[in-house]
């Protein structure tokens, strides 16, 4: 069957659902996927630096964060993107909580974060977040156990960063700072295809050596980490509101 034949073929998905299933299983993600329903388009002000690819790599941090800063934190069993634990440093109410800012009756956008008791144990991380100068929401350290490429791909997702974010306020994006040194591990990024799933033709990798910094629009890009090391990988993930302050920080941190 040629591509022209496919274009003109009748829609038999309702009469023969097993044919639709055969098409779906050709993608490595199960469908329907919750990420596919997260909005891509909105009127929120966004960063020019992310317009083209949805991410920007920044220069490496000159003075890496000491391991005593992140090993002493209180971690919670919370799964996202693999076998993970998270240490909340800033949350909606300052409590140790890995959930979003959407508690029933107290829904709010992922901004105006309040530091938790973990922040007292990592003063350099706290200073780093504050030095960006932009409004931050969730701030946390992720601990990720090793996972190979195929395992990682099955955990790809997009983030619902802008739920409850007023459309006239800055689009929320996320920054990464690698705390451990795993240069053979990488962040895997893909754009969404017309079927609402990650498009392998757009796959990009960002290496995860110690001190690596980058900013991602994780509501736009499907993402996950392939961690090939033999020890846990730690990284700082921070939500920031797009706007002049974040733009100035990006300009300062470009290579």
Report residues per predicted region:
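Polar low-complexity intrinsically disordered regions
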Residues: 1-15, 187, 194-197, 255
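Non-heme Fe(II)/2-oxoglutarate
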Residues: 2-140
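Histidine (H) residue identity feature
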Residues: 27, 33, 44, 155-157, ...
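Intrinsic-disorder/low-complexity, polar/charged segments enriched in Ser/Thr/Lys/Arg/Asp/Glu/Gln
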Residues: 56-57, 172-174, 235
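Structured loops at beta-to-helix junctions and adjacent beta-edge loops in soluble globular domains
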Residues: 61, 89-92, 144, 180, ...
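Catalytic core of non-heme Fe(II) oxygenases with the double-stranded beta-helix
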Residues: 128-213
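Catalytic core of Fe(II)/2-oxoglutarate
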Residues: 188-255
């Amino acid at each position: 069957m040629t591509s022209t034949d496919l274009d003109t073929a009748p829609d038999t998905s309702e009469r023969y659902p097993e044919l639709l299933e055969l098409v779906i299983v050709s993608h490595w993600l199960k469908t329907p996927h919750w990420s596919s329903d997260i909005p891509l388009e909105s009127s929120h002000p966004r960063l020019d630096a992310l317009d083209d690819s949805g991410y920007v790599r920044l220069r490496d941090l000159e003075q890496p964060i000491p391991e005593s800063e992140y090993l002493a934190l209180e971690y919670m069993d919370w799964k996202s993107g693999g076998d993970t634990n998270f240490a909340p440093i800033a949350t909606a109410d300052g409590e140790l909580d890995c959930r979003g800012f959407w508690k029933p009756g107290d829904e709010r956008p992922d901004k105006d974060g309040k530091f938790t008791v973990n922040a007292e144990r990592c003063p350099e991380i706290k200073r780093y977040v504050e030095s960006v100068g932009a409004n931050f929401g969730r701030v946390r350290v992720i601990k990720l156990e090793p996972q190979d490429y195929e395992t990682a791909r099955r955990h790809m997702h997009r983030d619902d960063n802008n739920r409850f974010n007023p459309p006239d306020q800055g689009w929320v994006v996320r920054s990464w700072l690698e705390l451990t040194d795993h240069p053979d591990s990488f962040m895997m990024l893909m754009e969404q295809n017309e079927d609402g799933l990650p498009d392998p033709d757009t796959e990009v990798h960002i290496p995860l050596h110690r001190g690596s910094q980058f900013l991602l629009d994780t509501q736009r890009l499907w993402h996950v980490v392939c961690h090939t090391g033999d020890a846990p990988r730690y990284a700082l993930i921070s939500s920031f509101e797009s706007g002049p302050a974040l733009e100035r920080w990006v300009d300062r941190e470009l290579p």
